[in-house]
């Protein structure tokens, strides 16, 4: 080999070594940056800062689509930031590899979308995994009972004729209620009592304008239902409704039918499906007591907040409010035709029943 060829060969080897060195360095740097990115994302995730953690997990999933942990973290971030439909794909990848938290979030996701049978399966799997690790299962057993209750309720979905809906700002929902005088009137608590502080509660006043029902916060910081009567042009005789109605949770948004004894209200306790649910009770004049409240069925109640049931008998119209499928700060006011004789939706079509229970559309 002549000197020239030797130098060329040596130069090529040096070049290859340099390339290998650079590639190795870049791979090492990439690995370090990935580790730093993962650590930072996990820190944000554990702090509940899902929106901030989401971009990092998205990149990690793109690089390693089969990684079960990345899929679970990214799926949870999507769920917690409102992208529930998109989250399902990633949570299912994690669940296939038995990632514990994936089952919990799939249970929640299926519950939110009225797939209660599947939600029951996911929560049962989650409970079984917790039990194997000797972790507390009680909160999730209670959640499972809530899912089973929702499934039973969907099976008994009422055939309700909903004729219109209106999306409004949450604080302005009462503007959608158009009651005739004989049905009484509704006001915000802060407006009726002329308070500067806004309050998420309402006041119902009867047609005679001599009796009110309203919700007010107690020293324990939950809403309870009260009533007052007008005495000599002044409101007085304040009474809290009995504990058959009020509870350790929140009771709010009362409305009294023109018979003066039937009361609709919303509660966050008593086995609700999620948030506020609608209930009805009746005052027994002979015993001076209220009957055990009855939870309304679907489509009136949902996994979201449902409240302010009002029926104007003279108009033969009813209203109720729900934040189901609505962005933060918005609610939907549904207008329906009341039916004194409750009728079940008679169909074996599960998708139709799910659609009518959730009010996916109004036809």
Task: Please provide the spans of the model-predicted regions.
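Alpha-helical segment of the N-proximal tetratricopeptide repeat
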Residues: 36-66, 73
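Short helix-capping/linker turns of helical repeat alpha-solenoids
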Residues: 66, 98-99
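Short, conserved micro-motifs composed of acidic
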Residues: 80, 101, 105, 112, ...
